[in-house]
Structures are given as C-alpha cells and as structure tokens.
C-alpha cells in the first residue's frame, strides 16, 4: 500500500529574531555554569516545564521552577559546552535544537534539547525544554564530537 500526502515540507527562512532567541538559550547555559537561578528565571516562563528521556528510555518531567535549586546546586555539572544545531522562528513562536555536554566528561555524556519559545509582550521566553540523552539522539548525538 502506498500512502500519498498533500503535505509539503517547507524550508524556513532565517529566524528574524535569531540573536534574541539565542540569548534566551545562553541564559539557560549560563544558569547552569554560573549556578545563577536568576538567569534561569530570566529565560524561562514562570510556568515552563521540562521533560527528558534518560539513557534507559525512562521519562522524567517537572516544572522548571521545581528544578532550579537542584540545577544550581553543588552536585550539578558546571562546565557545560553547547552547540546550537538549529533555530526556527515563525512569528511569535520559535524552536531551538541544542546539543550540550560537560567539558570534562565529553560529548558521549551529553544531551540534545529542543526548546520551545514564545514571544510574549515583545520578550522571548522558554516555555518548554524537551531533551534526550545523546545515546538516544540519532544524528544529533555526534554534533558535539
């Protein structure tokens, strides 16, 4: 059986607000590396959520606000390196695909995130972070190598 579709795939133009969108992602990275809860709160919407699949495929999910103390705590990695793999914007909505890993531990222990952002009252806010361990990330797993 052959399936046909009238759906077309369009290549999006460059994101007009690329710098502003990437700045939100930089706040996310800086929040970890500088253990600065204010940076997280500046970048994430107050009702943002995160979800991820860990190496065994299990799902973990929480409101971002409930995770901030752990993220800035002494036991959390503080040497994240990252690479933005894509930025797509359609008006007031944007997505960023991000590869990140510990400099000390290397790319094999990293994560691939998709961040969903909204422009609210002229300000970009990260509404949702969905991630997977690089061992489950397909082509994006080698981006940081």
Go through each PLM region and give its residues.
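Short secondary-structure capping/turn micro-motifs that flank functional sites
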Residues: 48-49, 135
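Residue-level detection of beta-strand scaffold positions
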Residues: 27-28, 39, 99-101, 114
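Short, hydrophobic secondary-structure boundary micro-motifs
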Residues: 41-42, 51-53, 127
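Short, low-complexity N-terminal intrinsically disordered segments enriched in polar/charged residues
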Residues: 1-46, 58, 62-65, 138, ...
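Surface-exposed, charged secondary-structure patches
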Residues: 20-23, 49-108
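Short beta-strand segments enriched in hydrophobic/aromatic residues
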Residues: 44, 100-102, 130-133
């Amino acid at each position: 059986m052959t399936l046909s579709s009238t759906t077309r795939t369009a290549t999006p133009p460059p994101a007009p607000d690329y710098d502003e969108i990437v700045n939100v992602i930089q706040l996310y990275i800086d929040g970890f590396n500088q253990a600065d809860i204010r940076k997280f709160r500046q970048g994430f919407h107050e009702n943002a959520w995160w979800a991820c699949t860990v190496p065994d495929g299990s799902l973990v999910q929480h409101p971002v606000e409930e995770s901030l103390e752990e993220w800035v705590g002494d036991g959390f990695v503080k040497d994240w390196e990252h690479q933005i793999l894509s930025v797509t914007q359609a008006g007031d909505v944007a997505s960023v695909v991000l590869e990140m890993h510990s400099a000390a531990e290397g790319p094999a222990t990293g994560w691939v995130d998709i961040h969903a952002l909204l422009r609210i009252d002229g300000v970009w806010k990260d509404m949702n972070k969905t991630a997977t361990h690089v061992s489950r990330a397909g082509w994006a797993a080698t981006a940081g190598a």
